[in-house]
């Protein structure tokens, strides 16, 4: 007797369960047969699985372009929680919840001033609470997460976070604490070079009254010792690193407009196969400009090669330069493999869909989109693998 | 600077006029209440209560400007001291918040009805019909 199951997405995110097991939900369905008046009980188990993604970045917590590209690949637009604190740093979509790790500050702005520490210092962050809450969400338990208000500098009343399918923890320290690191199914480090960081902060801050080149430079230099001590070492643990550097196509370029972006992918990560260009494991240098790809100065150059990164075997895919016409990206996409696309041209479609996002014409947009596809693939593989394991356990 | 007693909750969303005669909306209501339901927390944390500064005139732009001046003064003597580094860290945090506020204002188009309808699409005021 076939039984159809109808449930809403909201039901999948429900924390209500009928058994002591916190990792599965059971739905009892009753069906009345027309010939007889007997009722049948059908038991269906809906497994709620949460994967945890860590993203380390210097700033721009929760509202970054990367987050919007990521949640777009997973489906649905991420928005702040409805009816909640308007200063919340959390983003929620149908499948994804993005948590800003600034919410786990143990010192607010005034406490940090008193203690003379930056937000990058581990002493200003509560790693015990971070670990407990990420672990609870991964196990399907909702948490009351604190909210750090970036405007007032104070800790606001907490908000209730339901366990999602994909949990992204984004901020300064997703890979700092070993316990939190072990909870991550995949981790990414955004490695912005000092020159690019300076150029981006000029672009961001010169619109603000009071700022000047001197103040922007002083701010970066003051934070650098703590950044080098507590943030930068995390990249050795990342499964993927996106390095953003000035271009090498323009000699002595100091504008920071044209970027060279490297996607460094670790080999041997479970459920993750690195992307490759032309032939897996080969060394490629490729200028795709010609009849199929329009390029203006300074052009585009791709590199692909195996390498070593912190004594770990990696594959590196690099793009220097920028696209003139995004619709022609399909030509480049057709030469990349292991993209985990569901149909031909999905990368190009995603890029065109968000052509207005910053970085859409250079490697940052391309590699962020590719990482989003790899995370979706990782989620699907992990869910399928757990389903298989459960089926085998029953046998 | 006036201070407000701890626990007093003020939520305000007002239009301020800056020195350039431009109306500036705060990014959202500013919640100054720093007390919360401690019983709901999963761990015990010692929270030191302290006076809260009132929402400053001119919104976050003025706060950024003040923090930059303060950082420059703090760092005049010893640029590698803890006070100096913490002061510039505050500038960085406030600059990022100001940037987000600008982006949000740009994205929302400063239309309060659109903002309201985003959060409450089911209400009568927000209904649209295709025919």
Curated annotation (Swiss-Prot), chain A:
Matching PROSITE patterns = PHOSPHORIBULOKINASE (PS00567)
Coiled coil residues, start to end: none
Regulation of this protein's activity per its record: Light regulated via thioredoxin by reversible oxidation/reduction of sulfhydryl/disulfide groups.
What SUPFAM superfamilies does the annotation carry?
Answer: P-loop containing nucleoside triphosphate hydrolases
Enzymatic reactions = D-ribulose 5-phosphate + ATP = D-ribulose 1,5-bisphosphate + ADP + H(+)
Q: Which E.C. number(s) belong to this protein?
A: 2.7.1.19
CDD domains reported in the protein's UniProt record: PRK (cd02026)
Q: Which cysteines are joined by disulfide bonds?
A: 61-100
Q: Where in the cell is it found?
A: Plastid, Chloroplast
Q: Where is the transit peptide?
A: 1-46
Cell membrane among keywords:
no
Pathway assignment reads: Carbohydrate biosynthesis; Calvin cycle
Q: Which Gene3D superfamilies match?
A: P-loop containing nucleotide triphosphate hydrolases
GO-annotated molecular function: ATP binding; disordered domain specific binding; phosphoribulokinase activity; protein homodimerization activity
- InterPro entries per record: P-loop_NTPase, PRK, PRK/URK
In this record, what's one Pfam family? PRK
Q: One GO cellular component term, please give it.
A: thylakoid
Task: Give the family, as the similarity comment puts it.
Answer: Belongs to the phosphoribulokinase family.
NCBIfam families, per database record: PRK07429.1
Q: What is this protein called?
A: Phosphoribulokinase, chloroplastic
Q: Record the organism.
A: Arabidopsis thaliana (Mouse-ear cress)
What does UniProt list as this organism's lineage? Eukaryota, Viridiplantae, Streptophyta, Embryophyta, Tracheophyta
UniProtKB/Swiss-Prot annotation, chain B:
Where primarily located? plastid
**Reported effect of changing residue 75 to S?**
Normal under reducing conditions, but can form dimers under oxidizing conditions. Impaired formation of a ternary complex with PRK
In alphabetical order, the GO MF annotations are: copper ion binding; enzyme binding; nickel cation binding; protein-containing complex binding; protein-macromolecule adaptor activity
Q: Which organism is it from?
A: Arabidopsis thaliana (Mouse-ear cress)
Region Disordered: which residues? 97-131
Q: How is it modified after translation?
A: Contains two disulfide bonds; only the oxidized protein, with two disulfide bonds, is active in complex formation. The C-terminal disulfide is involved in the interaction with GAPDH and the N-terminal disulfide mediates the binding of PRK with this binary complex.
What does the UniProt induction comment state? Induced by light. Repressed by darkness, cold, anaerobic treatment, heat and sucrose. Changes conformation depending on redox conditions.
Mind telling me where the transit peptide is?
1-53
Name the chain's protein. Answer: Calvin cycle protein CP12-2, chloroplastic
